[in-house]
């Protein structure tokens, strides 16, 4: 009889523990953070899971930004979307127009969490804010601006001041020639050429990229990056390329690897590349602001953000959304947002995270770590330098890559390439405009 009682009690306890295990709400989080960045994403998720045993954030690397966005949309159509999808900034208009999302402000409201949207840096939050409601549609996460990384040891060898990176594109062209003369095979390379050499070149020099304030004022915007200033800039890079001073090594982050391997003396890349550079560079390096065009009056203006935000997908259970809200709230806590900023090089997305980082003395100990923030806040943004909100922008970036590659291979002049990119890109904008009105 006692044995039967023990058996029954053991069975009851087993079922109870099984019930507790089954009660854990699993929350898939698809992202594009690899290398050191991916490790930090995993670390944040693990700490949240330990503090919130009823929920389990499961980060899944789904490839680069384009691949992750495509995978997320395809999964939504089949009813298998993750709860959280990281989408890069140029996918914002696409996500806004889709019926696949649940706005983050609604997620917090439904979860009963009093979430202060004003804590986010305004120039970052504005990129992801709905103009009609004034609320965030997605939560800023890994926001960045392009910065200039340079090899201080190579500078010394070339007779250049290692504490003075080039401030203008004209200076950069001069520096690359000297670096090459001193033995560097690659003086300068650039990743993400559309984002850096056209989108941010335009904003940093106070030029529009598209009409309608870069699309923020309507879907009937047209591209405008084939103006004399942009053409002149691409012509400068073309001339450097012909001399061997500028090396085109790929559309994404390939130039960062070329830099930290010591092959290229300088590169313009995301501030978020700092984590990998810090890990792999075996030489002294520095961080400088993006160069500006010395011939453009009023430059530099302000940088526009890159990186990505976190979107919440439709069609999930209430308990899943509660867990998502708690996780997003966790990410925005000053200590967590500050740690993410310090370990990765991405911008501090909240004012409190920036202040905490400053109080901790991080910027004093790590000169250049605040470059991305200083660029973004260099001057109050003009209506057409606060960012981009253009439909089909990922595909437009591909077009820009194709056309710029035709310049580097000598098949087109800078004017021909940018004219064609604008023409092809405008066709995609008209398709998006038509679809958004249907």
Swiss-Prot record:
Name this polypeptide is given: sn-glycerol-3-phosphate-binding periplasmic protein UgpB
Keywords: Periplasm, Signal, Transport
Protein's job: Part of the ABC transporter complex UgpBAEC involved in sn-glycerol-3-phosphate (G3P) import. Binds G3P.
Subunit field text: The complex is composed of two ATP-binding proteins (UgpC), two transmembrane proteins (UgpA and UgpE) and a solute-binding protein (UgpB).
Coiled-coil portions: none
GO annotation terms (biological process): transmembrane transport
Subcellular location(s) per record: Periplasm
Gene Ontology cellular component annotations, sorted alphabetically: outer membrane-bounded periplasmic space
InterPro entries, per database record: Bact_solute-bd_prot1, SBP, SBP_1_CS
Gene responsible for this protein: ugpB
SUPFAM superfamilies for the chain: Periplasmic binding protein-like II
């Amino acid at each position: 009889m006692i044995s039967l009682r023990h058996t029954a009690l053991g069975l009851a306890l087993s079922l109870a523990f099984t019930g507790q295990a089954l009660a854990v709400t699993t929350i898939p989080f698809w992202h594009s953070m690899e290398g050191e960045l991916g490790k930090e994403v995993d670390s944040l998720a693990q700490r949240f899971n330990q503090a919130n045993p009823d929920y389990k954030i499961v980060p899944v690397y789904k490839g680069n930004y384009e691949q992750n966005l495509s995978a997320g949309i395809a999964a939504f159509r089949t009813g298998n979307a993750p709860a959280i999808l990281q989408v890069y900034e140029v996918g914002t208009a696409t996500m806004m127009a889709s019926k696949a999302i649940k706005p983050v402000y609604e997620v917090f409201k439904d979860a009963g969490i009093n979430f202060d949207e004003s804590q986010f840096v305004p120039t970052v939050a504005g990129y992801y804010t709905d103009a009609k409601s004034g609320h965030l549609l997605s939560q800023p996460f890994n926001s960045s601006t392009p910065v200039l990384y340079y090899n201080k040891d190579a500078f010394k060898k070339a007779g250049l001041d290692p504490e003075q990176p080039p401030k203008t594109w004209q200076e950069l062209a001069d520096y690359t020639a000297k670096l090459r003369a001193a033995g560097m095979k690659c003086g300068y390379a650039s990743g993400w050429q559309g984002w850096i050499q056209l989108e941010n070149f335009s904003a940093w020099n106070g030029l529009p990229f598209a009409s309608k304030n870069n699309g923020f004022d309507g879907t009937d915007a047209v591209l405008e990056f084939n103006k004399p200033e942009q053409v002149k800039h691409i012509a400068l890079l073309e001339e450097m390329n012909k001399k061997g001073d500028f090396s085109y090594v790929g559309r994404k982050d390939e130039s960062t690897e070329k830099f930290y391997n010591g092959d290229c003396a300088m590169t313009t890349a995301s501030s978020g590349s700092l984590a990998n550079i810090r890990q792999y560079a075996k030489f002294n390096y520095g961080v400088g602001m993006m160069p500006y065009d010395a011939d453009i009056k009023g430059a530099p203006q302000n940088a526009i953000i890159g990186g990505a935000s976190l979107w919440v997908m439709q069609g999930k259970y209430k308990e899943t959304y509660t867990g998502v809200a708690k996780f997003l709230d966790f990410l925005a806590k000053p200590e967590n947002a500050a740690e993410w900023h310090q370990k990765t090089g991405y911008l501090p997305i909240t004012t409190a995270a920036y202040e905490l980082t400053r109080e901790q003395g991080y910027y004093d100990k790590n000169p250049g770590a605040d470059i991305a923030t200083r660029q973004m806040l260099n001057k109050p943004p003009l209506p057409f330098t606060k960012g981009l909100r253009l439909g089909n922008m990922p595909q437009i970036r591909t077009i820009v890559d194709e056309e710029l590659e035709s310049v580097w291979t000598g098949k087109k002049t800078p004017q021909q390439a940018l004219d064609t990119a604008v023409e092809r890109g405008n066709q995609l904008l008209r398709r998006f405009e038509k679809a958004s009105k249907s």
